[in-house]
Swiss-Prot record:
<feature type="binding site">
    <location>
        <position position="615"/>
    </location>
    <ligand>
        <name>AMP</name>
    </ligand>
</feature>
<feature type="binding site">
    <location>
        <position position="447"/>
    </location>
    <ligand>
        <name>Mn(2+)</name>
    </ligand>
</feature>
<dbReference type="GO" id="GO:0030552">
    <property type="term" value="F:cAMP binding"/>
</dbReference>
<dbReference type="GO" id="GO:0001780">
    <property type="term" value="P:neutrophil homeostasis"/>
</dbReference>
<feature type="region of interest" description="Disordered">
    <location>
        <begin position="51"/>
        <end position="77"/>
    </location>
</feature>
<dbReference type="GO" id="GO:0048471">
    <property type="term" value="C:perinuclear region of cytoplasm"/>
</dbReference>
<feature type="modified residue" description="Phosphoserine">
    <location>
        <position position="659"/>
    </location>
</feature>
<dbReference type="InterPro" id="IPR040844">
    <property type="entry name" value="PDE4_UCR"/>
</dbReference>
<keyword id="KW-0597">Phosphoprotein</keyword>
<feature type="binding site">
    <location>
        <position position="410"/>
    </location>
    <ligand>
        <name>Zn(2+) 1</name>
    </ligand>
</feature>
<feature type="binding site">
    <location>
        <position position="447"/>
    </location>
    <ligand>
        <name>Mg(2+)</name>
    </ligand>
</feature>
<dbReference type="Pfam" id="PF00233">
    <property type="entry name" value="PDEase_I"/>
</dbReference>
<keyword id="KW-0460">Magnesium</keyword>
<dbReference type="GO" id="GO:0043197">
    <property type="term" value="C:dendritic spine"/>
</dbReference>
<keyword id="KW-1003">Cell membrane</keyword>
<comment type="similarity">
    <text>Belongs to the cyclic nucleotide phosphodiesterase family. PDE4 subfamily.</text>
</comment>
<dbReference type="GO" id="GO:0071466">
    <property type="term" value="P:cellular response to xenobiotic stimulus"/>
</dbReference>
């Protein structure tokens, strides 16, 4: 399968200059500091190199301790509008999804036209301001180590104005760009224009144009910048990928956010534990089952695992023929109503619940048949309608109707969402038909035979599946095994007319995409995509080539992952129905854990779970950062999705019940526990030693007034500042 090669090019403004100053916006008070999160806001005076914070500021940030931390924690962060992608194709060059780009031109060939491919345009100034995710906050507010792995700020990209760069590897590249630019200024060297000198044709800056003081200052800053880069590179573990630097940074930042959330209230602690246990890939303690449970499991282990569990006999006729296939692939007495619903097949937010109601609860078969007809995939890959419907009905039968959320309704919703994301204008003509087939098929099978419990539950109970897959992505591996095994059933092989090479490639892609739906891999997926996009933003070549399997599957994996986490981006009516279903499934798992005498998983206890708060946390820490990154890739096509997401988040925030104040003694205990959880010590600086003493105080006492951030336990977004007078005994004549 061949298709025109697609590239993503970053185009620079014709008026970009080679060097520009940077300014830092930090929230300081004249007499007091505010405790919170800082956010670097560099503004370009003129473009040409990636703007970074001054080295002196970065070095002081790296070495600082939480004492006297003069930083502010904004409750809302202004949205930096993201670049768009315009798509064209390169007719003279072909991309083979199995083999990569056609020979004859290097992907990094500077003669390659930047106007042909995926072009990252500058941001549109008219876009409304929107909250940014926690990824754009400082990651070192309370970092005591002077060897922080990443910058303490977010950085604007070189050719995209205020697009902030947050991934460590892209920040190192940006810093090296500044070093190179400063070197040309200091040495007055001017070579022929090349991909690293986009502004080489500008008037040269001569050595004498810099005063001696400015020259020495620039030389010292350049040396310090280079030292910073070396310091970062020396700490990189050679067996780690550069995107793992971003993954570790994001995990560290999320852990800090969750720590804050857990300290606010009991319900916040439960939400924090749920997000941490579900979306962070870490080794959890395995709960040892009771002896009676061991006896039950022992009987299961005695069965030979020679077959894939979950595969059952057909519950429908396998003798379908083309003449018996209905218009929508399913029998229905409500064809007109179903046709009306399917008019939204290509729209974000199709009501899949109505489709299920009009299709005799066959939403997956109906949606998949409609998508394959819409995309002409049946004809392209020579799939007979009867074989396709037979397989889809067999697949749908292997979704459990008694599971509240992870059933065929969810699979149909993810498949339709993937179909819409593949059709986004920014990605038009980017993916081959085989890749499209693989993505939609992966979405359809990604939760087949889901038992309605989590991977950790299966591991803790020593289930047969956990033993078979060695506790690694247990359910995701099982979904793949069942999905592919069903192709071997009678009249079910929808890929029988693919070539051997196509089948192998499709299988590899589907496996990669379904394994990516393991929520514990979320941070790695997010970091991979963000690193890829930001790295190409800061490189002078400005070209993101989707000409190899790794880059292309990375986009597809994140696409299916986005579709899997798309409920909060749909209309509030649909979102609330999905929320009710997932909470019902969680509570059913909690009941099973209670019956077994196990510790109940976070958000699975129907007596204590805070549904509204869990959805706000889910959006803030998981869904928003993911869709924000996806919007970076397909700007401006995802703006409406982000708007809906923010509206839904605000609605759930408004629905959080206001808890009454606890008794005084209980509040005292909570405060004591909160203080014990703090991982840093707050030290306030001494007031001017010549200041007036308070009446009744001796010379060994001083008064210090500082501004602290007081956070509402039920609403972190509302902050108020309170002046606190603290009397402290001065035991030293030296300022602390």
């Amino acid at each position: 399968m061949k298709k025109s090669r697609s590239v993503m090019a970053v185009t620079a403004d014709d008026n970009l200059k080679d060097y520009f100053e940077c300014s830092l916006s930090k929230s300081y008070s004249s007499s007091s500091y505010t405790l919170g999160i800082d956010l670097w806001r560099g503004r370009r005076c003129c473009s040409g190199n990636l703007q970074l914070p001054p080295l002196s500021q970065r070095q002081s940030e790296r070495a600082r301790t939480p004492e006297g931390d003069g930083i502010s924690r904004p409750t809302t962060l202004p949205l930096t509008t993201l670049p768009s992608i315009a798509i064209t194709t390169v007719s003279q060059e072909c991309f083979d999804v199995e083999n990569g780009p056609s020979p004859g031109r290097s992907p990094l060939d500077p003669q390659a036209s930047s106007s042909s491919g995926l072009v990252l345009h500058a941001a549109f100034p008219g876009h409304s301001q929107r909250r940014e995710s926690f990824l754009y906050r400082s990651d070192s507010d309370y970092d005591l180590s002077p060897k922080a792995m990443s910058r303490n700020s977010s950085l604007p990209s070189e050719q995209h104005g205020d697009d902030l760069i947050v991934t460590p590897f892209a920040q190192v590249l940006a810093s090296l760009r500044i070093v190179r630019n400063n070197f040309t200024l200091l040495t007055n060297l001017h070579g022929a224009p090349n991909k690293r000198s986009p502004a080489a044709s500008q008037a040269p800056v001569t050595r004498v144009s810099l005063q001696e003081e400015s020259y020495q200052k620039l030389a010292m800053e350049t040396l310090e910048e280079l030292d910073w880069c070396l310091d970062q590179l020396e700490t990189i573990q050679t067996y780690r990928s550069v995107s793992e630097m971003a993954s570790n940074k994001f995990k560290r930042m999320l852990n800090r956010e969750l720590t804050h959330l857990s300290e606010m209230s009991r319900s916040g602690n439960q939400v924090s534990e749920y997000i941490s246990n579900t979306f962070l890939d870490k080794q959890n303690d395995v709960e040892i089952p009771s002896p009676t449970q061991k006896d039950r499991e022992k009987k299961k282990k005695q069965q030979l695992m020679t077959q894939i569990s979950g595969v059952k006999k057909l519950m429908h006729s396998s003798s379908l023929n083309n003449t018996s296939i209905s218009r929508f692939g399913v029998n229905t007495e409500n064809e007109d109503h179903l046709a009306k619903e399917l008019e939204d097949l290509n729209k974000w937010g199709l009501n899949i619940f109505n489709v299920a109601g009009y299709s005799h609860n066959r939403p997956l078969t109906c949606i998949m048949y409609a998508i394959f007809q819409e995309r002409d995939l049946l004809k392209t890959f020579k799939i007979s309608s009867d074989t396709f419907v037979t397989y889809m009905m067999t697949l749908e039968d292997h979704y459990h109707s008694d599971v509240a959320y992870h059933n065929s309704l969810h699979a149909a919703d993810v498949a339709q969402s993937t179909h819409v994301l593949l059709s986004t204008p920014a990605l038009d003509a980017v993916f081959t038909d085989l890749e499209i087939l693989a993505a939609i098929f992966a979405a359809a099978i990604h939760d087949v035979d889901h038992p309605g419990v989590s991977n950790q539950f299966l591991i803790n109970t020593n289930s047969e599946l956990a033993l078979m897959y060695n506790d690694e992505s247990v359910l995701e591996n099982h979904h793949l095994a069942v999905g592919f095994k069903l192709l071997q059933e009678e009249h079910c092989d929808i890929f029988q007319n693919l070539t051997k090479k196509q089948r192998q490639t499709l299988r590899k892609m589907v496996i990669d995409m379904v394994l990516a739906t393991d929520m514990s891999k979320h941070m790695s997926l997010l970091a991979d995509l963000k690193t890829m996009v930001e790295t190409k933003k800061v490189t002078s070549s400005g070209v993101l080539l989707l000409d190899n399997y790794t880059d292309r599957i990375q986009v597809l994996r994140n696409m299916v992952h986005c579709a899997d986490l798309s409920n909060p981006t749909k209309s509030l009516e649909l979102y609330r129905q999905w929320t009710d279903r997932i909470m019902e499934e969680f509570f059913q798992q909690g009941d099973k854990e209670r019956e077994r005498g196990m510790e109940i998983s976070p958000m699975c206890d129907k007596h204590t779970a805070s549904v509204e708060k869990s959805q706000v946390g889910f959006i803030d820490y998981i869904v928003h950062p993911l869709w924000e990154t996806w919007a970076d890739l397909v700007q401006p096509d995802a703006q409406d999705i982000l708007d809906t997401l923010e509206d839904n988040r605000n609605w759930y925030q408004s629905m959080i019940p206001q808890s009454p104040s606890p008794p005084l003694d209980e509040r005292s205990r909570d405060c004591q526990g909160l203080m014990e959880k703090f991982q840093f010590e707050l030290t306030l600086e001494e007031e001017d030693s010549e200041g007036p003493e308070k009446e009744g105080e001796g010379p060994n006492y001083f008064s210090s007034t500082k501004t602290l951030c007081v956070i509402d336990p039920e609403n972190r977004d509302s902050l108020e500042e309170t002046d606190i007078d603290i009397a402290t005994e001065d035991k030293s004549l030296i300022d602390t």
